[in-house]
Amino acid sequence: MLMPLCGLLWWWWCCCSGWYCYGLCAPAPQMLRHQGLLKCRCRMLFNDLKVFLLRRPPQAPLPMHGDPQPPGLAANNTLPALGAGGWAGWRGPREVVGREPPPVPPPPPLPPSSVEDDWGGPATEPPASLLSSASSDDFCKEKTEDRYSLGSSLDSGMRTPLCRICFQGPEQGELLSPCRCDGSVKCTHQPCLIKWISERGCWSCELCYYKYHVIAISTKNPLQWQAISLTVIEKVQVAAAILGSLFLIASISWLIWSTFSPSARWQRQDLLFQICYGMYGFMDVVCIGLIIHEGPSVYRIFKRWQAVNQQWKVLNYDKTKDLEDQKAGGRTNPRTSSSTQANIPSSEEETAGTPAPEQGPAQAAGHPSGPLSHHHCAYTILHILSHLRPHEQRSPPGSSRELVMRVTTV
């Protein structure tokens, strides 16, 4: 019995001595530092648990817009402002809601004695609910001012006339009304119209076919001349017209010299030169046809170049002058009445009520119906002049929408 007991005591003594020696060999400062860190962390953990579990829950702030606050949002709002600490900049989740509260007067400030924090001392800053309500009121006022300014700008933009080419207002320059068009395509800037004429090569409106009243002031300095953009087809047309003109001049000059010169008498008697005369005559006819065919295109290109390299002044549309010009044109062309009678049928109702367009400008002017007859006469003369207008490509009746889009997209 004594031997096992002695062995057990011997084993216990050896273990104690071994642990003691290990404690002597281990670095004491490092072990003490680890123990101190562990104690500090445990103490901080217990303090945090005491703060979050043993404190009383704060009262939920009343909503400013009068609607009951959702339970999820009220459950999240559990951290009040803690004076000048790290929680003073925290805002409740009520500000994140998508709805904007209506502007209401801010609540009266609380007395200093009633504003206390959870630890019994006076708070140094107002609660988070007051700060959030003030910020929401400022945000609502700013939104209201922005909406008012946007509405006023839209209203003023709808009343302000715009250029039908660049879609800018009078701040970019003086707006003119150079043709009969009305509505949103009535006004345009003078530089925009000159640039449009230089790109299109036509000096009349493509909607109402009214020829712009443009006065040439002066030509620019040759050092300031600008080149216009040409397509491949336009370049070929210009080259063909120039080469055809040069060949025609040279050929006609040689034919005239060989026909009337005494020194070329032997050429006129030679068979080979007689064949050349026939070939040159045929080539001259071809060149004349080429020049006639490409002449209008080259003339439009020249007018485009002239619009860019000359200073112009565009006049506004004068309705009275336009009507006078149409009446004068109707008097100088009396044969237009017969052509309109063949193209436009008349009816008994038009004859009884208003003068028909085919009755001629003299009868329309003497009819007692007044301004209506003048309008009929004006539109009839305009229609006739548009048919008699030379070297102008007429668009089909269904292409008016395309023309409007071309005007508005430049």
UniProtKB/Swiss-Prot annotation:
Pathway: Protein modification; protein ubiquitination. GO terms for biological process: protein ubiquitination. Its main location: Golgi. Expressed in brain and placenta. It is an enzyme of class 2 (transferase). It holds the Pfam family RINGv. Residues 1-18 form the signal peptide. It is a multi-pass membrane protein. Residues 100-112 have a biased composition (Pro residues). It comes from Homo sapiens (Human). It is found in: Golgi apparatus membrane. The gene is MARCHF4. The chain crosses the membrane at residues 238-258, 272-292. Residues 92-136, 324-372, 390-410 are annotated as: Disordered. One of its GO terms (molecular function) is zinc ion binding. It catalyses: S-ubiquitinyl-[E2 ubiquitin-conjugating enzyme]-L-cysteine + [acceptor protein]-L-lysine = [E2 ubiquitin-conjugating enzyme]-L-cysteine + N(6)-ubiquitinyl-[acceptor protein]-L-lysine. This is E3 ubiquitin-protein ligase MARCHF4. The RING-CH-type zinc finger domain is required for E3 ligase activity.
